[in-house]
């Protein structure tokens, strides 16, 4: 299986995060916990994985490890990185 982002078959994490940006902003505006914000982000990553994106497992591991350390600022920096990473 070719796992590059070719058309509509495999979706990039970036594409899904940006499509669901309002959901993420709403969570941030409500001041949700890091775990609750992560649930929204992980659902986006799971959507990418379901489309065949091989980088989704690694992204999930990265976000979950940041949550385990409780570093909100690092989490937001990583989230912005993923939202601008066209090929991830």
Language model regions located:
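Cysteine-centered motifs
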Residues: 85-88
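Short terminal alpha-helical segments
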Residues: 2-30
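Acidic, low-complexity, intrinsically disordered interaction modules
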Residues: 34, 39-69, 73-77
């Amino acid at each position: 299986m070719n796992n590059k982002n070719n058309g509509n078959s495999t979706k990039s994490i970036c594409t899904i995060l940006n499509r669901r940006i309002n959901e993420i902003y709403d969570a941030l505006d409500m001041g949700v916990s890091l775990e609750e914000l992560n649930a929204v982000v992980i659902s986006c990553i799971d959507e990418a994985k379901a489309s065949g994106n091989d980088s989704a497992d690694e992204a999930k591991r990265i976000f979950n490890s940041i949550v385990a350390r409780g570093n909100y600022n690092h989490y937001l920096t990583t989230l912005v990185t993923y939202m601008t990473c066209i090929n991830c």
